Amino acid sequence: MDYMIGVDLGTTSTKSVLFDLKGHIIASSSKGYPLYRDKPDMAEEDPVEIFEALIDSLTDVVRAGKLENDDKILGVSFSSAMHSLIAFDKDWKPLTRVITWADGRAFKYSEQLKESGVGQEIYSKTGTPIHPMAPLSKLLWLKNEQQDIYKKSKHFLGIKEYIFHRLFKTNKMDISIASGTGLFNIFNLDWDQQALQITGLSKDQLPTPVEPYEIERGMSKEYAKVIGIPVDTPFIYGAGDGPLSNLGVNAIQPGVAAVTIGTSGAIRVVTDKPKIDPKGRTFTYALDRNHWVVGGPVNNGGDVFRWARDNLFDAEKSTAALLGIDSYDLLTEIASKVPAGADG
């Protein structure tokens, strides 16, 4: 039989799912990792921990699928949390952890961009709201407050690009992820010169933009052996998790919106052309060059639920572990018994 594997590089875990070609789930695996909040407004992850979670989750589903010799994995395709940033030196050694979308240390610099009017100019070309989540703002923070790291940095990638670099030694970024950086012109599908000038970067410090359908073959023999797949298994770059969520629930027709709540939340619609809000309130990210996802986010979704579980419901968390059930399922069941109009 033929199979596909879907991978989601999420904020708190990496998930891999093995499907048959009828869409039936054959096996799945999720591997978590911490979000480091060592300082105020910090929200970082360890790229090595995420890479190891990917390898472990892929290994799990391949083993659980019990594939026979004549079975074939036609491809491994990715979705990824957007807006992450990692700085590398000339030898591709990471100089930072993964600075995630949830990191707010660049707030000062996003506000300066807004107040100067330059932010609106950049937004009108990139479709990314001027916000501390965007790599545009993160780069300004690095440039001004982490100058030693900034000066040593020769490459800037997101988490998915780091994964592909580890597996294939490539330096590419799909246009969906690129469109969420605040550095990418969504009208000419290339890095925006004004954004590069403001951050002090050159194009060769950023990955080559590619279509979400771009395929890599010839992965590291070491990791192919660990996972249990052929070296020439196709790996597809895929796109950002937000745009792909619309595709996943088939919310791609005019007038159809998708609401998703993960660690964060958003409401999105799909259009055939980029749509820019004159007041800079909405985002416009690529699904591919012919489909654009327009919407608005909220930065606290499931993240709030996790905080409540970890800080307010220790007893329920322990009870769930003893019962062998998911702690979120237990809390949801308890919450469902609260009558309507209970004021919280």
Q: Residue locations for each model-derived region?
A:
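N-terminal glycine/serine-rich phosphate-binding loop of ATP-dependent small-molecule kinases
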Residues: M1-T96, S124, K152, A224-K225, ...
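Active-site core segments that coordinate phosphate-bearing ligands/cofactors
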Residues: I5-G6, F107, K114-H131, S137-K172, ...
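Glycine-rich phosphate-binding loops at beta-strand->alpha-helix junctions
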Residues: S13, E211-M219, A239, G265
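A glycine- and small-aliphatic-rich helix-loop capping segment at beta-alpha/alpha-beta transitions
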Residues: F19-I26, F88-V98, E145-Q147, I252, ...
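Residue-level signal for inorganic ion chemistry
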Residues: G23, D46, V76, D103, ...
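Short beta-alpha connecting loops at secondary-structure transitions
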Residues: D38-D41, T96-I99, Y285-G295
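Short beta-strand-loop/turn "lid" adjacent to the catalytic site in phosphate-handling enzymes
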Residues: G65-W101, P129-P135, F164-N185, T208-E211, ...
